[in-house]
Amino acid sequence: MAKKVVAVIKLALDAGKANPAPPVGPALGQHGVNIMMFCKEYNARTQDKAGYVIPVEISVFEDRSFTFITKTPPASVLITKAAKIQKGSGESAKGSVGSISRAQLEEIAKTKLPDLNCTSIESAMRIIEGTARNMGVSISD
C-alpha cells in the first residue's frame, strides 16, 4: 500500500546551496522532516547546476519520510543569463533592457519544455518569448 502524503512543499532554492536556515528549515521542520538529509540530497542532485535557482517540490509522507522532484530553472532566470542582465525591466512597455537571439530563445525553450504545458518547441518558444517581452527583453533574428 502506498504511503499517505501529508504535505507538498514548493521551494525555489539556489542549486547546491540548500542549508537548514530559512526558508528550508521552517518549511520542512513543521512537518518533522529530517532537514539535513534533504539539504544533502538536494545539494548532491543540483551541484552541476550551480548559479541557477532550482524549484523543488517536496512530498512529505505520514511517517515523516519524503521524496522530492527538481524542476527546470524559471524562464526569467534563463532569460536574464542569456541576455547578460541583472534583472528584467520594471517598465517593459517603455523600452528594452537587453536582447536575446532566436537561437538562445530556442535553447531556453528546449530546457523548459518538460515543465511547460505544451508539446512542441514552437509553442514553448512562444511562451518563453512572452516571458521575455514582459521582462523588457527583445528577441532579435
Swiss-Prot record:
The keyword Transcription does not apply. InterPro entries: Ribosomal_uL11, Ribosomal_uL11_bac-typ, Ribosomal_uL11_C, Ribosomal_uL11_C_sf, Ribosomal_uL11_CS, Ribosomal_uL11_N, Ribosomal_uL11_N_sf. One of its GO terms (molecular function) is large ribosomal subunit rRNA binding. Keywords: Methylation, Ribonucleoprotein, Ribosomal protein, RNA-binding, rRNA-binding. Pfam families: Ribosomal_L11, Ribosomal_L11_N. CDD domains: Ribosomal_L11. One or more lysine residues are methylated. One of its GO terms (biological process) is translation. It comes from the Bacteria. Belongs to the universal ribosomal protein uL11 family. This is Large ribosomal subunit protein uL11. It comes from Synechococcus sp. (strain CC9605).
